[in-house]
Amino acid sequence: MATKDPTAVERANLLNMAKLSIKGLIESALSFGRTLDSDYPPLQQFFVVMEHCLKHGLKVRKSFLSYNKTIWGPLELVEKLYPEAEEIGASVRDLPGLKTPLGRARAWLRLALMQKKMADYLRCLIIQRDLLSEFYEYHALMMEEEGAVIVGLLVGLNVIDANLCVKGEDLDSQVGVIDFSMYLKNEEDIGNKERNVQIAAILDQKNYVEELNRQLNSTVSSLHSRVDSLEKSNTKLIEELAIAKNNIIKLQEENHQLRSENKLILMKTQQHLEVTKVDVETELQTYKHSRQGLDEMYNEARRQLRDESQLRQDVENELAVQVSMKHEIELAMKLLEKDIHEKQDTLIGLRQQLEEVKAINIEMYQKLQGSEDGLKEKNEIIARLEEKTNKITAAMRQLEQRLQQAEKAQMEAEDEDEKYLQECLSKSDSLQKQISQKEKQLVQLETDLKIEKEWRQTLQEDLQKEKDALSHLRNETQQIISLKKEFLNLQDENQQLKKIYHEQEQALQELGNKLSESKLKIEDIKEANKALQGLVWLKDKEATHCKLCEKEFSLSKRKHHCRNCGEIFCNACSDNELPLPSSPKPVRVCDSCHALLIQRCSSNLP
């Protein structure tokens, strides 16, 4: 018989132990049906077996004080090969209770199992055999095919959910000893397994009832909280409605106040307009009276000019008669020429004054064109005055033409006037008197023109005052327009508030309907909870006959639990599936519970 390699036998033993521990851990975890913690015995034995597998063939490292043989070195190498493992390494180093490398390695294995990536991490490590040769001997388990087989078996552990507390455990001082009694089967173990199965069934029933109660309590509490929140929102909406109604009342009062103020402002403006109209009419009447006085003065001036023209004609006739008195007439004519030159100067001054009057009238006409309809009569009066002034200028031009004709006649009659000089001397005195009278009349005309200028200045001041009053009235009208705009804005806001009020009333009605529906649902849930609290999960041993058809159970007629009432029925009487509050997936329900649940669902539907 050839002797076997002891290292190969060790690898085979460790591989078989790893298979048994992984298989037993998966089967026990699936039958246990809950997340595993650190006190679970199969899980503890799994970590012990993995520790032995990783320690097999590990090289011894020398230090100053002692020899060091630990698995933390190759596990720490995983961070460089697999970047996602950096988080585990950092968290292991940050743990406060770990002092030895072995404790860090044990914590690393537990964290890798919780992340369900232990197989991935160790696969990356096995592939890099040149790096592993620094830590392991050539005949080590991690360097041979058995290591790859163990890594493949570790993939099955991804089915398990584990919640391990690493901080509180003393991982440095634990002794890793494999308990072989867990993997050896006896008759007592078989009896214990049956007991464990019964205990597990009882625990499942208990957990099922507890979950039912917990879910029902949570639904009831959530519905209570919803009812409270809806009541609070209802009270808030009622308060907001009251506030909105108060705001609407205030806005209506402000609206009435603004309307009354608007009416008062309109009354005041109308009164002010009437007063201004009366003032304008009185001023126009005074203006008309003053214009009538001016017309009379202009008529008197025309009469005087006519008299002068007649006197000129008489003088011409007398000059024609008095040709013999030429020498005396020459002296008189020189005097007359001087007087004529003076009169021409005065006429030029009068022309300038008339031009000034024209310019003033034009300016007044342009200013009066910018005023409103109430000042049209003044513009017509000014137009009449301009026509009168034009007539006066035309008459003055005619007088100038006549004077020129008289001068020509005088030049022609110089030869004939020598005969009548003596007679003219006697009449020259009378002419001088007439000239002095005319000079007095000219002085009176100048004073009249000054009075007219002053009167025009007063008219301009009155017009300026009227313009100021018009601008003031325009400002008041603009204020009234702005008040109207504000009033319209307030009306729009009032309409918007009314819309919000109606929308809030509709929302309150909808909330009331929803509250009534939720109250009905709460009552249904309370009734269901009361009915479920009285139900008990019936044991298999207690039931020998079906509750509905009362047929005896046998090998062919199996027992089935109803997940709603907990009673036991045959397959024919419980061949129904419905989703329950305890489980979202459809579960087995008896015929009576099926009919009751369908009736309840149909009644809850709108």
From Swiss-Prot:
Tissues where this protein is expressed: Expressed in brain, lung and testis.
Residues in FYVE-type zinc fingers: 540-598
Every RUN domain range: 37-169
Pfam families: FYVE (PF01363), RUN (PF02759)
Gene Ontology molecular function: SH3 domain binding; zinc ion binding
Coiled-coil blocks: 210-534
GO biological process: regulation of endocytosis
Keywords: Coiled coil, Metal-binding, Nucleus, Zinc, Zinc-finger
PROSITE patterns, per the entry: RUN (PS50826), ZF_FYVE (PS50178)
InterPro entries per the UniProt record, alphabetical: FYVE_RUFY2, RUFY1-3, Run_dom, Run_dom_sf, RUN_RUFY2, Znf_FYVE, Znf_FYVE-rel, Znf_FYVE_PHD
GO cellular component, one term: endosome
SUPFAM superfamilies, per the entry: FYVE/PHD zinc finger (SSF57903), RUN domain-like (SSF140741)
The keyword NAD belongs to this UniProt entry's keyword annotation: no
Subcellular location: Nucleus
Binding residues annotated for Zn(2+) 1, in chain numbering: 546, 549, 570, 573
Residues the record lists as binding Zn(2+) 2: 562, 565, 590, 593
The keyword Zinc-finger is assigned to this record: yes
Tree of life domain: Eukaryota
Quaternary data: Interacts with BMX.
PANTHER family: RUN AND FYVE DOMAIN-CONTAINING PROTEIN 2, RUN AND FYVE DOMAIN-CONTAINING PROTEIN 2-LIKE PROTEIN
UniProt name for this protein: RUN and FYVE domain-containing protein 2
Protein species of origin: Homo sapiens
